[in-house]
Amino acid sequence: MYINTLFWKQNPTGDKKNQEEKMQKTLLSCLITTLLLITVADSMKDTSVRLKLAHRDTLLPKPLSRIEDVIGADQKRHSLISRKRNSTVGVKMDLGSGIDYGTAQYFTEIRVGTPAKKFRVVVDTGSELTWVNCRYRARGKDNRRVFRADESKSFKTVGCLTQTCKVDLMNLFSLTTCPTPSTPCSYDYRYADGSAAQGVFAKETITVGLTNGRMARLPGHLIGCSSSFTGQSFQGADGVLGLAFSDFSFTSTATSLYGAKFSYCLVDHLSNKNVSNYLIFGSSRSTKTAFRRTTPLDLTRIPPFYAINVIGISLGYDMLDIPSQVWDATSGGGTILDSGTSLTLLADAAYKQVVTGLARYLVELKRVKPEGVPIEYCFSFTSGFNVSKLPQLTFHLKGGARFEPHRKSYLVDAAPGVKCLGFVSAGTPATNVIGNIMQQNYLWEFDLMASTLSFAPSACT
Protein backbone atom coordinates (compact mmCIF):
# COMPACT_ATOMS: atom_id res chain seq x y z
CA MET A 1 0.00 0.00 0.00
CA TYR A 2 1.97 2.97 -1.25
CA ILE A 3 -0.40 5.72 -2.36
CA ASN A 4 -4.00 6.80 -1.95
CA THR A 5 -5.67 9.28 -4.29
CA LEU A 6 -9.23 10.52 -4.79
CA PHE A 7 -10.95 11.49 -8.03
CA TRP A 8 -14.38 12.63 -9.11
CA LYS A 9 -16.85 10.48 -10.92
CA GLN A 10 -18.55 12.50 -13.66
CA ASN A 11 -22.34 12.97 -13.53
CA PRO A 12 -23.73 13.88 -16.95
CA THR A 13 -27.24 14.74 -15.72
CA GLY A 14 -28.69 17.50 -13.53
CA ASP A 15 -27.74 21.14 -13.09
CA LYS A 16 -24.20 22.22 -12.39
CA LYS A 17 -24.71 22.60 -8.65
CA ASN A 18 -26.24 19.16 -8.26
CA GLN A 19 -23.56 17.73 -10.50
CA GLU A 20 -20.80 19.14 -8.32
CA GLU A 21 -22.51 17.93 -5.15
CA LYS A 22 -22.90 14.43 -6.55
CA MET A 23 -19.36 14.39 -7.88
CA GLN A 24 -18.11 15.38 -4.45
CA LYS A 25 -19.74 12.23 -3.14
CA THR A 26 -17.99 9.85 -5.49
CA LEU A 27 -14.26 10.28 -4.91
CA LEU A 28 -11.69 7.65 -5.71
CA SER A 29 -8.75 6.74 -3.54
CA CYS A 30 -5.86 4.43 -3.99
CA LEU A 31 -6.50 0.79 -4.17
CA ILE A 32 -4.73 -1.19 -3.14
CA THR A 33 -3.62 -3.41 -2.59
CA THR A 34 -4.73 -6.98 -1.27
CA LEU A 35 -6.40 -10.14 -2.61
CA LEU A 36 -8.51 -13.04 -1.34
CA LEU A 37 -8.02 -16.75 -1.60
CA ILE A 38 -9.55 -20.07 -0.85
CA THR A 39 -7.91 -23.40 -0.20
CA VAL A 40 -8.41 -26.86 1.25
CA ALA A 41 -6.47 -30.06 0.85
CA ASP A 42 -9.51 -32.22 0.13
CA SER A 43 -10.65 -30.31 -2.98
CA MET A 44 -7.49 -29.55 -4.88
CA LYS A 45 -8.21 -31.41 -8.10
CA ASP A 46 -9.26 -29.47 -11.19
CA THR A 47 -9.97 -26.29 -9.27
CA SER A 48 -8.57 -22.82 -8.71
CA VAL A 49 -9.47 -20.06 -6.27
CA ARG A 50 -11.53 -17.16 -7.57
CA LEU A 51 -12.44 -13.95 -5.73
CA LYS A 52 -14.47 -10.96 -6.87
CA LEU A 53 -12.56 -7.68 -6.84
CA ALA A 54 -14.25 -4.29 -6.36
CA HIS A 55 -12.76 -0.80 -6.26
CA ARG A 56 -12.78 0.68 -2.75
CA ASP A 57 -14.23 4.02 -3.92
CA THR A 58 -17.51 2.29 -4.74
CA LEU A 59 -18.45 2.30 -1.07
CA LEU A 60 -18.77 5.63 0.75
CA PRO A 61 -18.86 9.12 -0.81
CA LYS A 62 -16.08 11.50 0.19
CA PRO A 63 -15.50 15.28 -0.19
CA LEU A 64 -12.89 16.78 -2.48
CA SER A 65 -10.75 17.77 0.49
CA ARG A 66 -9.81 14.11 0.94
CA ILE A 67 -7.75 14.21 -2.24
CA GLU A 68 -5.07 16.15 -0.40
CA ASP A 69 -5.12 13.66 2.48
CA VAL A 70 -4.87 10.71 0.13
CA ILE A 71 -1.99 12.09 -1.92
CA GLY A 72 -0.22 12.95 1.30
CA ALA A 73 -0.69 9.39 2.49
CA ASP A 74 0.60 8.12 -0.84
CA GLN A 75 3.77 10.14 -0.44
CA LYS A 76 4.28 8.91 3.13
CA ARG A 77 3.77 5.37 1.96
CA HIS A 78 6.27 5.81 -0.82
CA SER A 79 8.91 7.23 1.50
CA LEU A 80 8.94 3.99 3.56
CA ILE A 81 9.01 1.90 1.08
CA SER A 82 7.97 -20.05 -4.75
CA ARG A 83 5.67 -22.11 -4.65
CA LYS A 84 6.37 -25.24 -6.84
CA ARG A 85 3.10 -27.15 -6.68
CA ASN A 86 0.76 -26.89 -9.68
CA SER A 87 -2.96 -27.59 -9.83
CA THR A 88 -5.81 -27.25 -12.30
CA VAL A 89 -7.98 -25.87 -9.49
CA GLY A 90 -7.80 -22.31 -8.23
CA VAL A 91 -9.20 -19.74 -5.81
CA LYS A 92 -11.64 -17.24 -7.29
CA MET A 93 -12.60 -13.95 -5.57
CA ASP A 94 -14.78 -11.06 -6.68
CA LEU A 95 -12.69 -7.92 -7.17
CA GLY A 96 -14.22 -4.47 -7.56
CA SER A 97 -13.72 -0.72 -7.27
CA GLY A 98 -14.21 1.11 -3.99
CA ILE A 99 -15.61 4.33 -5.45
CA ASP A 100 -19.01 3.84 -3.82
CA TYR A 101 -17.20 3.61 -0.47
CA GLY A 102 -15.28 6.83 -1.06
CA THR A 103 -11.89 5.33 -1.69
CA ALA A 104 -9.52 4.43 -4.54
CA GLN A 105 -8.73 0.98 -3.23
CA TYR A 106 -10.07 -2.31 -4.59
CA PHE A 107 -12.09 -4.69 -2.42
CA THR A 108 -12.91 -8.35 -2.17
CA GLU A 109 -14.65 -10.48 0.46
CA ILE A 110 -13.27 -13.29 2.57
CA ARG A 111 -14.89 -15.64 5.07
CA VAL A 112 -13.03 -16.07 8.34
CA GLY A 113 -13.43 -18.55 11.20
CA THR A 114 -15.64 -21.51 12.10
CA PRO A 115 -18.47 -20.85 11.48
CA ALA A 116 -17.29 -18.60 8.67
CA LYS A 117 -18.06 -14.87 8.86
CA LYS A 118 -17.89 -12.61 5.82
CA PHE A 119 -15.64 -9.50 5.72
CA ARG A 120 -14.88 -6.87 3.08
CA VAL A 121 -11.12 -6.33 2.78
CA VAL A 122 -8.73 -4.12 0.85
CA VAL A 123 -6.72 -6.03 -1.74
CA ASP A 124 -3.09 -5.00 -1.23
CA THR A 125 -0.15 -6.49 -3.13
CA GLY A 126 2.16 -4.44 -0.90
CA SER A 127 1.02 -5.89 2.45
CA GLU A 128 2.20 -9.11 4.08
CA LEU A 129 -0.44 -9.43 6.81
CA THR A 130 -4.08 -10.37 6.35
CA TRP A 131 -6.19 -8.98 9.19
CA VAL A 132 -9.80 -8.19 10.10
CA ASN A 133 -11.59 -5.99 12.60
CA CYS A 134 -11.64 -8.31 15.60
CA ARG A 135 -12.34 -8.69 19.30
CA TYR A 136 -10.09 -11.19 21.06
CA ARG A 137 -11.80 -11.22 24.44
CA ALA A 138 -13.21 -7.76 24.87
CA ARG A 139 -16.87 -7.09 24.25
CA GLY A 140 -18.47 -3.90 23.10
CA LYS A 141 -20.55 -2.23 20.42
CA ASP A 142 -19.15 -1.77 16.95
CA ASN A 143 -20.32 0.38 14.06
CA ARG A 144 -18.95 -2.09 11.51
CA ARG A 145 -18.60 -5.83 11.05
CA VAL A 146 -16.41 -7.42 13.69
CA PHE A 147 -14.92 -10.90 14.07
CA ARG A 148 -15.43 -12.25 17.59
CA ALA A 149 -12.57 -14.67 18.15
CA ASP A 150 -14.18 -16.52 21.05
CA GLU A 151 -17.07 -17.55 18.80
CA SER A 152 -14.78 -19.32 16.31
CA LYS A 153 -13.86 -22.97 16.91
CA SER A 154 -10.74 -22.71 14.73
CA PHE A 155 -9.17 -19.53 16.20
CA LYS A 156 -5.80 -20.18 17.88
CA THR A 157 -3.45 -17.43 19.02
CA VAL A 158 0.32 -17.40 18.45
CA GLY A 159 2.14 -17.38 21.81
CA CYS A 160 4.38 -14.46 22.71
CA LEU A 161 7.24 -16.78 23.78
CA THR A 162 7.34 -18.72 20.52
CA GLN A 163 10.09 -18.50 17.92
CA THR A 164 7.41 -17.47 15.45
CA CYS A 165 6.58 -14.38 17.50
CA LYS A 166 10.08 -13.39 18.56
CA VAL A 167 11.84 -13.96 15.22
CA ASP A 168 9.68 -14.94 12.27
CA LEU A 169 7.08 -12.19 12.67
CA MET A 170 9.48 -9.33 13.33
CA ASN A 171 8.98 -7.98 9.81
CA LEU A 172 5.25 -7.93 10.52
CA PHE A 173 5.81 -5.61 13.49
CA SER A 174 5.46 -8.17 16.28
CA LEU A 175 5.97 -6.70 19.76
CA THR A 176 8.27 -7.96 22.51
CA THR A 177 5.64 -7.53 25.23
CA CYS A 178 5.13 -10.89 26.97
CA PRO A 179 3.86 -10.64 30.57
CA THR A 180 2.89 -14.34 30.79
CA PRO A 181 3.59 -17.49 28.74
CA SER A 182 -0.08 -17.64 27.75
CA THR A 183 -0.16 -14.09 26.40
CA PRO A 184 -0.77 -13.90 22.62
CA CYS A 185 1.85 -12.40 20.32
CA SER A 186 0.79 -8.82 19.62
CA TYR A 187 1.58 -6.45 16.76
CA ASP A 188 1.55 -2.79 15.81
CA TYR A 189 1.48 -3.07 12.01
CA ARG A 190 2.55 0.13 10.26
CA TYR A 191 1.85 1.10 6.66
CA ALA A 192 3.92 3.51 4.61
CA ASP A 193 1.03 5.97 4.27
CA GLY A 194 0.82 6.41 8.05
CA SER A 195 -2.04 3.96 8.63
CA ALA A 196 -1.69 1.39 11.40
CA ALA A 197 -3.39 -1.66 12.91
CA GLN A 198 -2.91 -3.15 16.38
CA GLY A 199 -3.95 -6.56 17.64
CA VAL A 200 -2.80 -10.15 18.17
CA PHE A 201 -1.57 -12.81 15.75
CA ALA A 202 -3.52 -16.03 15.36
CA LYS A 203 -3.93 -19.07 13.14
CA GLU A 204 -7.39 -19.26 11.62
CA THR A 205 -9.40 -20.85 8.83
CA ILE A 206 -10.28 -18.82 5.74
CA THR A 207 -13.03 -20.14 3.48
CA VAL A 208 -12.92 -19.25 -0.21
CA GLY A 209 -14.65 -20.07 -3.46
CA LEU A 210 -13.03 -22.13 -6.19
CA THR A 211 -13.14 -21.83 -9.95
CA ASN A 212 -15.17 -25.06 -10.13
CA GLY A 213 -17.95 -23.48 -8.07
CA ARG A 214 -17.15 -25.28 -4.83
CA MET A 215 -16.08 -23.81 -1.52
CA ALA A 216 -12.81 -24.70 0.23
CA ARG A 217 -11.41 -24.22 3.71
CA LEU A 218 -7.88 -22.95 4.17
CA PRO A 219 -6.96 -23.87 7.77
CA GLY A 220 -4.08 -22.53 9.85
CA HIS A 221 -3.54 -19.29 7.94
CA LEU A 222 -1.80 -16.51 9.87
CA ILE A 223 -4.16 -13.59 10.43
CA GLY A 224 -4.22 -10.46 12.51
CA CYS A 225 -7.04 -9.97 15.00
CA SER A 226 -7.03 -6.15 14.94
CA SER A 227 -8.71 -4.52 17.92
CA SER A 228 -7.89 -1.04 16.64
CA PHE A 229 -6.79 0.56 13.39
CA THR A 230 -6.39 4.07 12.09
CA GLY A 231 -5.87 5.71 8.71
CA GLN A 232 -7.71 6.45 5.50
CA SER A 233 -6.42 3.27 3.86
CA PHE A 234 -9.16 1.31 5.62
CA GLN A 235 -12.11 3.53 4.70
CA GLY A 236 -15.13 1.30 4.07
CA ALA A 237 -13.14 -1.85 4.82
CA ASP A 238 -13.21 -4.51 7.54
CA GLY A 239 -9.55 -5.35 7.07
CA VAL A 240 -6.78 -6.09 4.58
CA LEU A 241 -5.96 -9.06 2.37
CA GLY A 242 -2.15 -9.20 2.28
CA LEU A 243 -0.87 -10.32 -1.12
CA ALA A 244 2.80 -9.35 -0.97
CA PHE A 245 5.54 -11.86 -1.80
CA SER A 246 6.01 -13.17 1.73
CA ASP A 247 5.90 -16.48 3.60
CA PHE A 248 2.98 -15.19 5.69
CA SER A 249 0.84 -13.57 3.00
CA PHE A 250 -2.36 -14.99 1.57
CA THR A 251 -0.53 -15.30 -1.74
CA SER A 252 1.91 -17.78 -0.19
CA THR A 253 -0.85 -19.90 1.30
CA ALA A 254 -3.01 -20.01 -1.83
CA THR A 255 -0.23 -20.58 -4.35
CA SER A 256 1.25 -23.40 -2.25
CA LEU A 257 -1.97 -25.33 -2.81
CA TYR A 258 -3.27 -24.19 -6.18
CA GLY A 259 -0.18 -23.42 -8.23
CA ALA A 260 2.34 -20.60 -8.26
CA LYS A 261 0.27 -18.10 -10.24
CA PHE A 262 -2.25 -15.42 -9.44
CA SER A 263 -4.05 -13.00 -11.71
CA TYR A 264 -6.43 -10.06 -11.57
CA CYS A 265 -8.10 -7.52 -13.81
CA LEU A 266 -8.90 -4.12 -12.31
CA VAL A 267 -12.16 -2.65 -13.57
CA ASP A 268 -12.34 1.08 -14.29
CA HIS A 269 -11.78 2.87 -10.98
CA LEU A 270 -15.00 4.86 -11.52
CA SER A 271 -17.11 1.70 -11.74
CA ASN A 272 -19.82 1.23 -9.12
CA LYS A 273 -19.94 -1.71 -6.74
CA ASN A 274 -22.15 -3.73 -9.10
CA VAL A 275 -19.25 -4.00 -11.56
CA SER A 276 -16.52 -6.46 -10.65
CA ASN A 277 -13.96 -8.87 -11.98
CA TYR A 278 -12.01 -11.63 -10.27
CA LEU A 279 -8.83 -12.27 -8.39
CA ILE A 280 -7.71 -15.81 -9.18
CA PHE A 281 -5.05 -18.00 -7.61
CA GLY A 282 -4.13 -20.97 -9.76
CA SER A 283 -5.28 -21.95 -13.24
CA SER A 284 -7.30 -19.43 -15.26
CA ARG A 285 -8.77 -19.92 -18.72
CA SER A 286 -8.66 -16.18 -19.41
CA THR A 287 -4.90 -15.99 -18.91
CA LYS A 288 -4.36 -19.04 -21.09
CA THR A 289 -6.27 -17.61 -24.05
CA ALA A 290 -5.51 -13.89 -23.78
CA PHE A 291 -2.95 -12.23 -26.01
CA ARG A 292 -0.08 -11.70 -23.57
CA ARG A 293 3.14 -9.80 -23.25
CA THR A 294 5.66 -11.10 -20.77
CA THR A 295 8.51 -9.54 -18.81
CA PRO A 296 10.71 -10.80 -15.95
CA LEU A 297 9.29 -10.39 -12.44
CA ASP A 298 11.92 -9.62 -9.81
CA LEU A 299 10.81 -11.09 -6.49
CA THR A 300 13.98 -10.40 -4.50
CA ARG A 301 15.14 -6.92 -5.50
CA ILE A 302 12.59 -4.81 -3.57
CA PRO A 303 10.93 -7.24 -1.12
CA PRO A 304 8.13 -7.89 -0.42
CA PHE A 305 6.93 -5.99 -3.51
CA TYR A 306 6.52 -7.21 -7.09
CA ALA A 307 9.26 -5.47 -9.05
CA ILE A 308 9.64 -5.22 -12.83
CA ASN A 309 12.51 -4.00 -14.98
CA VAL A 310 11.49 -0.80 -16.75
CA ILE A 311 14.17 0.41 -19.17
CA GLY A 312 12.47 3.53 -20.50
CA ILE A 313 9.30 5.50 -21.23
CA SER A 314 8.18 6.88 -24.58
CA LEU A 315 5.47 9.30 -25.70
CA GLY A 316 4.32 8.33 -29.15
CA TYR A 317 7.44 7.49 -31.12
CA ASP A 318 9.76 9.60 -28.94
CA MET A 319 11.80 7.93 -26.20
CA LEU A 320 12.14 10.29 -23.24
CA ASP A 321 15.56 11.31 -21.94
CA ILE A 322 15.50 9.61 -18.53
CA PRO A 323 18.74 8.59 -16.76
CA SER A 324 19.20 4.83 -16.56
CA GLN A 325 19.80 4.94 -12.79
CA VAL A 326 16.12 5.86 -12.34
CA TRP A 327 15.28 2.25 -13.23
CA ASP A 328 18.19 0.65 -11.34
CA ALA A 329 17.07 -0.88 -8.03
CA THR A 330 20.68 -1.19 -6.87
CA SER A 331 20.98 2.61 -7.07
CA GLY A 332 17.83 3.34 -5.07
CA GLY A 333 15.53 3.24 -8.10
CA GLY A 334 13.58 0.39 -9.63
CA THR A 335 9.86 -0.08 -10.28
CA ILE A 336 7.05 -2.00 -8.58
CA LEU A 337 3.39 -2.69 -9.33
CA ASP A 338 1.15 -1.91 -6.37
CA SER A 339 -2.60 -2.45 -6.14
CA GLY A 340 -2.71 -0.33 -2.97
CA THR A 341 -1.50 2.85 -4.71
CA SER A 342 -3.79 4.86 -6.96
CA LEU A 343 -1.61 7.29 -8.88
CA THR A 344 1.72 6.45 -10.49
CA LEU A 345 4.84 7.70 -8.71
CA LEU A 346 7.96 8.43 -10.72
CA ALA A 347 11.42 9.49 -9.63
CA ASP A 348 11.82 13.20 -10.24
CA ALA A 349 13.90 12.89 -13.42
CA ALA A 350 11.30 10.62 -15.03
CA TYR A 351 8.35 12.59 -13.65
CA LYS A 352 9.49 15.88 -15.20
CA GLN A 353 10.05 14.29 -18.59
CA VAL A 354 6.64 12.60 -18.62
CA VAL A 355 4.44 15.45 -17.38
CA THR A 356 6.10 18.20 -19.41
CA GLY A 357 5.99 15.99 -22.48
CA LEU A 358 2.26 15.30 -22.07
CA ALA A 359 1.48 18.92 -21.15
CA ARG A 360 2.68 20.07 -24.59
CA TYR A 361 -0.36 18.35 -26.09
CA LEU A 362 -2.71 20.15 -23.70
CA VAL A 363 -1.66 23.75 -24.41
CA GLU A 364 -5.10 24.66 -25.77
CA LEU A 365 -6.59 23.92 -22.35
CA LYS A 366 -6.44 26.31 -19.41
CA ARG A 367 -4.17 25.09 -16.65
CA VAL A 368 -5.86 25.27 -13.24
CA LYS A 369 -5.13 24.51 -9.60
CA PRO A 370 -8.31 23.10 -8.03
CA GLU A 371 -8.49 23.57 -4.29
CA GLY A 372 -7.41 20.53 -2.32
CA VAL A 373 -5.90 18.71 -5.32
CA PRO A 374 -2.12 18.47 -4.79
CA ILE A 375 -1.37 17.40 -8.35
CA GLU A 376 0.88 19.65 -10.40
CA TYR A 377 -0.64 19.43 -13.88
CA CYS A 378 -4.43 19.96 -13.96
CA PHE A 379 -6.53 21.45 -16.74
CA SER A 380 -9.99 22.91 -17.26
CA PHE A 381 -11.48 20.26 -19.46
CA THR A 382 -14.15 20.84 -22.10
CA SER A 383 -16.20 18.28 -23.96
CA GLY A 384 -14.70 19.52 -27.21
CA PHE A 385 -11.19 18.27 -26.45
CA ASN A 386 -10.28 14.98 -28.10
CA VAL A 387 -8.32 12.81 -25.65
CA SER A 388 -6.88 10.87 -28.57
CA LYS A 389 -4.69 13.91 -29.23
CA LEU A 390 -2.54 12.76 -26.34
CA PRO A 391 0.35 10.55 -27.44
CA GLN A 392 0.48 6.93 -26.35
CA LEU A 393 2.44 6.59 -23.11
CA THR A 394 4.54 3.40 -23.18
CA PHE A 395 6.59 1.69 -20.49
CA HIS A 396 9.39 -0.27 -22.19
CA LEU A 397 10.27 -3.40 -20.21
CA LYS A 398 13.14 -5.83 -20.07
CA GLY A 399 12.76 -8.56 -22.68
CA GLY A 400 11.10 -6.27 -25.22
CA ALA A 401 7.58 -6.15 -23.76
CA ARG A 402 5.73 -2.84 -23.79
CA PHE A 403 2.99 -1.73 -21.40
CA GLU A 404 0.69 0.79 -23.09
CA PRO A 405 -1.89 2.05 -20.56
CA HIS A 406 -5.16 3.54 -21.74
CA ARG A 407 -5.21 7.34 -22.03
CA LYS A 408 -7.91 7.60 -19.35
CA SER A 409 -5.41 5.97 -17.00
CA TYR A 410 -2.97 8.89 -17.18
CA LEU A 411 -5.39 11.79 -17.79
CA VAL A 412 -7.80 11.35 -14.90
CA ASP A 413 -10.87 13.16 -13.52
CA ALA A 414 -9.94 15.16 -10.42
CA ALA A 415 -12.83 17.62 -9.94
CA PRO A 416 -15.92 18.82 -11.86
CA GLY A 417 -14.67 19.91 -15.28
CA VAL A 418 -11.05 19.25 -14.33
CA LYS A 419 -8.66 16.53 -15.47
CA CYS A 420 -5.13 16.00 -14.21
CA LEU A 421 -2.08 14.08 -15.33
CA GLY A 422 -2.11 11.10 -12.96
CA PHE A 423 1.50 11.24 -11.80
CA VAL A 424 3.24 12.30 -8.61
CA SER A 425 6.93 13.03 -8.15
CA ALA A 426 8.53 10.50 -5.81
CA GLY A 427 11.74 12.50 -5.31
CA THR A 428 15.30 11.33 -5.92
CA PRO A 429 16.39 8.58 -5.58
CA ALA A 430 13.07 6.78 -5.37
CA THR A 431 11.21 3.60 -6.15
CA ASN A 432 8.83 4.09 -9.07
CA VAL A 433 5.32 2.79 -8.44
CA ILE A 434 2.80 1.84 -11.13
CA GLY A 435 -0.49 2.39 -9.31
CA ASN A 436 -3.87 0.78 -9.75
CA ILE A 437 -5.35 3.47 -12.02
CA MET A 438 -2.54 2.94 -14.51
CA GLN A 439 -3.14 -0.83 -14.29
CA GLN A 440 -6.91 -0.66 -14.91
CA ASN A 441 -8.50 -2.52 -17.84
CA TYR A 442 -5.52 -4.84 -18.15
CA LEU A 443 -5.32 -8.50 -17.23
CA TRP A 444 -2.25 -9.21 -15.07
CA GLU A 445 -0.78 -12.64 -14.32
CA PHE A 446 2.01 -13.09 -11.76
CA ASP A 447 3.88 -16.38 -12.25
CA LEU A 448 5.90 -16.85 -9.06
CA MET A 449 7.49 -20.10 -10.24
CA ALA A 450 8.79 -18.72 -13.54
CA SER A 451 9.31 -15.19 -12.11
CA THR A 452 7.40 -13.58 -14.96
CA LEU A 453 4.64 -11.00 -15.31
CA SER A 454 2.25 -11.39 -18.24
CA PHE A 455 -0.36 -8.82 -19.23
CA ALA A 456 -2.87 -7.90 -21.92
CA PRO A 457 -5.56 -5.24 -22.49
CA SER A 458 -8.94 -6.42 -21.22
CA ALA A 459 -12.47 -5.17 -20.63
CA CYS A 460 -12.34 -7.02 -17.28
CA THR A 461 -15.74 -8.60 -17.83
From Swiss-Prot:
<feature type="glycosylation site" description="N-linked (GlcNAc...) asparagine">
    <location>
        <position position="86"/>
    </location>
</feature>
<keyword id="KW-0809">Transit peptide</keyword>
<comment type="similarity">
    <text>Belongs to the peptidase A1 family.</text>
</comment>
<keyword id="KW-0325">Glycoprotein</keyword>
<dbReference type="InterPro" id="IPR001461">
    <property type="entry name" value="Aspartic_peptidase_A1"/>
</dbReference>
<dbReference type="GO" id="GO:0009507">
    <property type="term" value="C:chloroplast"/>
</dbReference>
<keyword id="KW-0378">Hydrolase</keyword>
<dbReference type="InterPro" id="IPR021109">
    <property type="entry name" value="Peptidase_aspartic_dom_sf"/>
</dbReference>
<feature type="glycosylation site" description="N-linked (GlcNAc...) asparagine">
    <location>
        <position position="274"/>
    </location>
</feature>
<protein>
    <recommendedName>
        <fullName>Aspartic proteinase NANA, chloroplast</fullName>
        <ecNumber>3.4.23.-</ecNumber>
    </recommendedName>
</protein>
<dbReference type="GO" id="GO:0007623">
    <property type="term" value="P:circadian rhythm"/>
</dbReference>
<feature type="domain" description="Peptidase A1">
    <location>
        <begin position="106"/>
        <end position="456"/>
    </location>
</feature>
<dbReference type="GO" id="GO:0010019">
    <property type="term" value="P:chloroplast-nucleus signaling pathway"/>
</dbReference>
<dbReference type="Pfam" id="PF14543">
    <property type="entry name" value="TAXi_N"/>
</dbReference>
<dbReference type="InterPro" id="IPR033121">
    <property type="entry name" value="PEPTIDASE_A1"/>
</dbReference>
<keyword id="KW-0645">Protease</keyword>
<feature type="active site">
    <location>
        <position position="338"/>
    </location>
</feature>
<dbReference type="InterPro" id="IPR034161">
    <property type="entry name" value="Pepsin-like_plant"/>
</dbReference>
<feature type="glycosylation site" description="N-linked (GlcNAc...) asparagine">
    <location>
        <position position="386"/>
    </location>
</feature>
<dbReference type="Pfam" id="PF14541">
    <property type="entry name" value="TAXi_C"/>
</dbReference>
<dbReference type="InterPro" id="IPR051708">
    <property type="entry name" value="Plant_Aspart_Prot_A1"/>
</dbReference>
<keyword id="KW-0064">Aspartyl protease</keyword>
<dbReference type="GO" id="GO:0006508">
    <property type="term" value="P:proteolysis"/>
</dbReference>
<dbReference type="InterPro" id="IPR001969">
    <property type="entry name" value="Aspartic_peptidase_AS"/>
</dbReference>
<dbReference type="InterPro" id="IPR032799">
    <property type="entry name" value="TAXi_C"/>
</dbReference>
<dbReference type="GO" id="GO:0005975">
    <property type="term" value="P:carbohydrate metabolic process"/>
</dbReference>
<dbReference type="GO" id="GO:0004190">
    <property type="term" value="F:aspartic-type endopeptidase activity"/>
</dbReference>
<dbReference type="GO" id="GO:0009744">
    <property type="term" value="P:response to sucrose"/>
</dbReference>
<dbReference type="InterPro" id="IPR032861">
    <property type="entry name" value="TAXi_N"/>
</dbReference>
<comment type="function">
    <text>Aspartic proteinase that can use azocasein as substrate and regulates endogenous sugar levels (e.g. sucrose, glucose and fructose) by modulating starch accumulation and remobilization. Influences general morphology and development.</text>
</comment>
<keyword id="KW-0150">Chloroplast</keyword>
<keyword id="KW-0934">Plastid</keyword>
<feature type="active site">
    <location>
        <position position="124"/>
    </location>
</feature>
